[in-house]
Amino acid sequence: MEDFKKENPYGLVYDNAITENVDGKVNIKPVNYTLNGLKISANLYLPANYDENKKYSAVAVAHPNGGVKEQVAGLYAQKLAELGYVTSAADASYQGASEGEPRLRDYPSNRIDDISGMIDYLIKMESVDNSKIGALGICGGGGYTTACSQTDKRIKAVATLSMFNSGRVRRNGFLDKQKDTIQERLIKSANARNKELEGEIVYEGFLPDMNDEELTKYMESLPEGLYKDGIYYCGLRYRHPKATGSYTTASFIKLMAFDVEDRMDLINQPLLMIAGSNADTLYMTKDAFEKATGTKNKELYLIEGATHIQTYWKEEYVEKVVNKLKDFFGENL
């Protein structure tokens, strides 16, 4: 995978990714645009036989924490384009190929505005019907998509896949098991911010700096679940050099004050939340879904047998997700 750029001219690392633009098929168009003074890197996916004089429904796709547009976000953007949608998958500000210093800053306000930035770009396209724009967020991108949709009503239909409540986990720990160390970790974050003033950037992350053999052994030592699967996906099978699984330690200051569940009642758009029935992150989707009291059109859809990360790549689960998204966006856009 070190030579992934040679394998795919667009740097895409997901299965069955576009390798060239062919007439009569979905095409990919790398684009850049400015958001809050930063150049954002995005991939636009155009449906087969795209005609710029026609009007299309569109979907913005937000990538997981620690990920990039060339991974699962690109997979689902391509799948939705195959269904006839114009789609966009953009790298978050400070992450991937998008600008921003320090690298890998992970502020919720930025991630939320990144989604609005994708909507901005789609709205400027003459071929997009502005009344038919939806959003799909995956993992952390799912949490930020629900947060964005609470107030950005240009989003007409909201979908999440394996939603991850970044603020809750950074604050309480995974499965809410680190509540007793909240203050200690806040002090650690404050100290990291002080170090940033001196030019030293401190990072947190789940992907250790190891070669393939070492990483495989480390992965095999972990219990089944999100982090073991995450190393397989991000560190081995679908790795990308800009998807490090890391974020600045100083980001904790902002992350720990954020919670997806806050103001979920402001979502009045159609809402679809998809998760694997065996995902150890399922509690986050269920809790957020329960608080989405402002919409009468909502559904929690479980992919039987799937774990969190398996919804990113396992063909049988991806197919079920795409079929559900086909129905949801077809009915609501």
Language-model features, listed with the residues they occupy:
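Short beta-strand element of the alpha/beta-hydrolase
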Residues: 54-64
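Conserved alpha/beta-hydrolase
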Residues: 79-99
